[in-house]
Amino acid sequence: MCNYKFETLQLHVGQEQPDPATDSRAVPIYQTTSYVFKNSAHAAARFGLADAGNIYGRLTNSTQDVLEKRIAALEGGVAALALASGAAAINYTIQALAQDGGHIVAQKTIYGGSYNLLEHTLPHFGITATFVDAHNLAEVENAIQGNTRAIYLETLGNPNSDIPDIDAIAEIAHRHSLPLVIDNTFGTPYLIRPIEHGADIVVHSATKFIGGHGTTLGGIIVDSGKFDWKASGHYPAIADPNPSYHGVSFADAVGPAAFVTYIRAILLRDTGATISPFNAFLLLQGVETLSLRLERHAENTKKVVAYLAHHPQVEHVNHPSLPEHPDHALYEKYFPNGGASIFTFNIKGWQKEAHKFIDSLKIFSLLANVADVKSLVIHPATTTHSQLTDEELADQGIAQNTIRLSIGTEHIDDIIADLEQAFEAVKAAE
């Protein structure tokens, strides 16, 4: 189906024909733990990876399989792996690349959970990271060490929607024989396909825009199929014979899909961050309307940004669509159809004013999720990024008067009216 447009692919890939057992047009929920083998030889072939197919529910499920094929197609990859959460997708990706003793060069303005994983958790497992200003290409390149195993970016940084130059950093990564990993949670494949700009691996918290309705946890890893895992000798887990599969080399056995196959066959098998069939089904419901929702998110965001940019109680708006934003040129290059519906602004005042504004909102929900059809709000410094020191917060552009918004799909007049009455509440409390 590679010749079809995005809007068609999001509806059909992975289930081009009705379900063969029931003729169901909707993707069924295959709520099972395990699968019957035809005979002993068939079972042995499945377990030995000689025959592709379902083995056990921790590894694969037919509902999950449709989701994986659909996201892989939308991102332009060769294969994907759906997992229980976005955190699992990021963790497995980093562990598969760095192993014990590896090093990651990471953009410093990333999701707080990813920052904590790289800065505090993974060092206990022998994996270290250097955080860099992704706008400074020399700093990115100079951070590469002999044990570096990947460069890690977000298409739109969290929470400020800053944008790295993916093409330029991909060139640096590949010149050093490193894969470029990009978290495209905020970008989505509808707005940007990082693989087309040189990314080798794309990860998602499917909980966000892919699901879109705040109901379902999930994560996705997409393999571009373009990285040569054998060339540098730095990725033995993927390229060399694996003792737990009788000497199978994933790079040799499955070729372009080696990376996600390794994670499925080893990390997922042994540590079990499995997505449930029902969650895979719910995420598929979200995928089917992804383009429609993103258009409305982008349309509403454009109007909210314009409103905030001229509001007398706003100190600063961090949105790359604004001409004065340092990433405006990159925004026009990588996001020609708009986007960045999760962004921050600084209210005049400090934490007291920020909290009063947030607590006065009526349509916006105060919660930790983003990219819901409902508009959301949070105070990053005391919640999502509260584990960071004051110095780390400042380094990521987060102050005590910074407020993160996730613009939903409600009517724009109601969204702006809610923001305005919250500003009035702040003024009345002075």
Identify the meaning behind each predicted range.
Residues 39-91, 113-120:
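Conserved N-terminal alpha-helix of the aminotransferase class I/II PLP-enzyme fold
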Residues 222, 344-346, 406-408:
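Short hydrophobic/aromatic beta-strand micro-patches
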